Amino acid sequence: LALTAAPMLALCGMVRAEGPQSQPAEPKHIQVQHILVGYGGSLPGKPITRTIEEAKKLAYEILENARKGADFDALVKQHTDDAHPGIYGMSNKGVATAAGEYPRSGMVGAFGDVGFKLKVGEIGIADANPKTSPYGYHIIKRVK
């Protein structure tokens, strides 16, 4: 089962609720590429057998390799439980969404929180969490 961007975003909790305004130091628009490391039961319809502990170990190994300079796109191809290339444009809270972007409020909370804190080229991680990142671990690289 291959997930495309639109279904994956729906799966990852797309909501239309307006939240508070973006923080002044945060950018208005970003583009990120991510690797989703799920675990058994975290992605409905995907037969993932790893445990949450195995997912955490794998996610942090990928993060370490990425921060050491491994080709991020190659890591996405090799490891993501989302569709390749895993690139998403996002507009911040209170900012109009440009063509091809998704509103930050429509993404899993931790995904946007990490993405908007990164500088271009930086890599971070959103830990699996039932409320803020229920689909697994997101290794996120800000590309724009």
Pin down the residues of each PLM region:
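Acidic/polar surface patches and capping/hinge elements
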Residues: 18-30
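A residue-level signal for beta-strand positions that form part of recognition/binding surfaces
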Residues: 29-34, 139
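Sterically constrained small-residue positions within well-ordered secondary structures
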Residues: 8, 26, 130-131
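Bacterial N-terminal signal peptides
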Residues: 2-12
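Peptidyl-prolyl cis-trans isomerase
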Residues: 48-144
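Acidic/histidine-rich, surface-exposed loop or edge segments in extracytoplasmic proteins
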Residues: 33-46
